[in-house]
């Protein structure tokens, strides 16, 4: 009886205590822009409680015993703030905090268990230490990702990642502010992703993940995905002028439209523009032109709602020297930077509108809505085989399309608590519709005469998806992320060359489950296991002839990795990974034919190291190995052409308090097979770049050098069968685009 009485008394006291608990809520702002700051780590010292600010910079702690608490707010490249607040019974203390910017201090960086499933620690460090200053660096910010340009700078880069020759985007999902970059059923190749509509100076953050493990990332996210986020506000207005070798000129300007008055109302708007011209280092002038114009508004229309509107337009036109065969250079027919068909080139444009709306309801539901629209035009002239098919007129082809793309992304998420466990549930829907007119493959001569139409048609492609994602934090150390998405595709192709003109369609769907585990031993060590299924869609010109069969090949992957700090000022991310892909049929855009592609298997190791050597000097290095093989083929004939087997990139970054900053970087890719039996080899290269800037409050002066040691290297390489005019028989060998020689560029920026 006495025990029952004591238990009853204890319950009464506990209930009374619970009835008089308090809380803390707050908003964190970027001091320079006065806009809310997301992903800030907020810790209640000594309690084990922590939170991460949401899209609106908000955080909340509930059920706190009345007392005095010490709060610590931290974010990469912002100065950590520590202060005290008193919690009283039945009240929620509300705080507004501004974080000032500061140099990155790796000693203050911790491995957070709150956002284990995001794993953006490395990317957050890189974007602060290695600001993106040219269009090629936009993609190179992703560890292990290599690119190659083989069309004079106007064409989308060829991408290599995790044992994939991704071509121009088939197996990596790229977005900008959530808007898709990859183009389905593109005239040149499936998943073609041209990022040149992004002004490098406006990139604020890059989120990425390798492998098919993220529930809200659908089509093309097999090798991985990357989302490039542009600035919501400019710190200052600026004008930048650059000039370099090979008749290279560039002008960039960004104007803050609302200024201090806008910041006081948590609003910002700017307009920015970029113009580039170069004749480049090839023997034949490239006459490359590019124009970008961007306008963006970001504002809090209510305390719990923000609206972001972005409009942009992009245009580019160029000539290029194409891919040249080894034998033409070795025989002296052309120089290393020469051309067989100097009339290759192209023109492209893209106009975008993007609206994003985020709100947090009184019950803490986070609702996101996004609508986007793009008008896109593309025309490319190429000649890969010279006179192989047509010994009189040559083999030049034209690939052309006009496209309207529109879509919607929406999600609703809520954090709930069951006992001491946290459950974040997200339900999302996505819709994308591509309407392409006049998608053409033609035989041309000198970019002036059409000799024959190989393919001509209209494409109507729809992708609708729904997904459910759950992040469960069972303890402060252990969390699980489980999700599933369903994607539905409907493809329609109208063949305008058919007699009579005919229209056919097909449809299919795919289910992609994900299951990820994270265990954070302490603020210096986290172990994770990622598993999941992803896919990439196939060209409509494959889907329709195949009747919707074998056109959504699944990719099954797993990563076992860890993030740890062996020393206070060192961060290491290491992972062993595996990926298996189903057989599929693919459309070869350069030939207009459908070919089978067999099963494939890849596995390898990734290692990324970030180390602060001194208060102002930082070192980074990435090492990536892969063993890509075709499944079901004989040993020795099962190589995957051009798939990278070893890559590495790294360097030193300097950030002096007096305004001097710079970097010295290298990138290396090893020899790799260029065909299935490795009898033709694509040679590797080691190239170094340098950048040096001196920045004060009103101006900046900079020098950048690509290929610092003037290495002669082949940026892209292909095993191609071709015939040069006058040759009796065709020859299969390496065809390449030369990489830049030593290339220096000076820049001056004025801030106001």
Model-derived regions, located:
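Membrane-embedded beta-barrel scaffold of Gram-negative outer-membrane proteins
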Residues: 262, 356, 360, 366-384, ...
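Gram-negative outer-membrane beta-barrel transporters
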Residues: 413, 476, 488, 576-580, ...
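Short, acidic, small-residue-rich periplasmic hinge/interaction motif at the N-terminus
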Residues: 29, 41-45, 74-78, 88-129, ...
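C-terminal beta-signal and adjacent terminal beta-strands/loops
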Residues: 4, 619, 671-672, 694-752
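Short acidic/polar hinge/loop motifs at secondary-structure boundaries
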Residues: 180-210, 228-229, 295, 547
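Short strand-turn segments of transmembrane beta-barrel domains in outer membranes
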Residues: 207-215, 225-259, 273, 559
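Transmembrane beta-barrel wall of Gram-negative outer-membrane proteins
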Residues: 243-277, 282-321, 345-362, 419, ...
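Face-selective signature of the C-terminal outer-membrane beta-barrel domain
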Residues: 300, 304-314, 346-496, 520, ...
